[in-house]
């Protein structure tokens, strides 16, 4: 019996496979080619890692003509990845040091997610999603506006109400897209903060997720 359990742990025992699982948690499904490009892997290498995740039932796949698409096998797969990640941060000093160096300049905005939702509903907060637009359409926090990296320009900023607090999120606590967006907003005089939760973490807390372009 225990040997069967190791099929799951063995599939997770590779940084590329963990990254692929994290990327799949952001969207309903993605092609092997798309995942390979995002993870900086060759298509052949990405395909090999994805087959390992498939064998452990952490992901599912479908074929459409010459393309193969993958998706997470369920919320359990995402929770397992999050639990491994959070355990490593809690238990390994070297991981905590790496995380501390990466997030040293952050000023997280949320201790109370329910309070953030209320502020968004009252129009006090402008919420932005710094992930690629395809991930936004697949699922995003209610009230968020898609703002992929590189889309913050003078025309965009001129249309914003400077009296509103800006909150930006991306793929989760270790994604840096939101950090770059927050820095850009602050350079232009906005009060801007980083939300460390991503869509998978938001969903795990039991809050609703919106889909589509708005």
PLM segments and residue spans:
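Catalytic cysteine-centered active loop of the rhodanese-like fold, especially the PTP/DSP P-loop
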Residues: 33, 58, 160-203
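Short, hydrophobic-biased segments on the C-terminal half of alpha helices
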Residues: 21-24, 50-51, 199
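Alpha-helical residues within the helix-turn-helix
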Residues: 37, 54-55
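Amphipathic alpha-helical dimerization/coiled-coil segments
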Residues: 3, 79-129, 212
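Short hinge/loop at the helix->beta-strand junction immediately C-terminal to the helix-turn-helix recognition helix
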Residues: 29, 40, 57-58, 207
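Beta-hairpin "wing" of winged helix-turn-helix
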Residues: 55-64, 71
């Amino acid at each position: 019996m225990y040997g069967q359990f190791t099929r799951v742990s063995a599939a997770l025992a590779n940084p590329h496979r963990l990254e692929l699982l994290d990327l799949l948690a952001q969207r309903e499904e993605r092609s092997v080619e798309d995942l390979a490009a995002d993870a900086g892997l060759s298509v052949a290498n990405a395909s090999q890692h994805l087959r390992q995740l498939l064998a452990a039932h952490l992901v599912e796949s479908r074929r459409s003509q010459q393309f193969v698409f993958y998706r997470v096998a369920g919320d359990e797969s995402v929770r397992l990845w999050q639990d491994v990640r959070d355990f490593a941060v809690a238990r390994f000093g070297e991981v905590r040091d790496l995380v501390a160096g990466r997030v040293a300049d952050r000023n997280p905005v949320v201790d109370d997610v329910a309070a953030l939702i209320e502020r968004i509903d009252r129009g006090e907060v402008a919420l932005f999603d710094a992930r690629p637009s395809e991930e936004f359409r697949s699922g995003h926090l209610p009230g968020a506006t898609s703002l992929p990296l590189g889309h913050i320009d003078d025309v965009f900023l001129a249309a914003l109400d400077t009296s509103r607090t800006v909150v930006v999120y991306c793929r989760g606590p270790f994604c840096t897209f939101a950090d770059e967006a927050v820095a850009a907003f602050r350079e232009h005089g906005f009060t801007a903060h980083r939300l460390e939760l991503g869509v998978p973490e938001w969903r795990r807390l039991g809050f609703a997720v919106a889909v589509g372009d708005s």
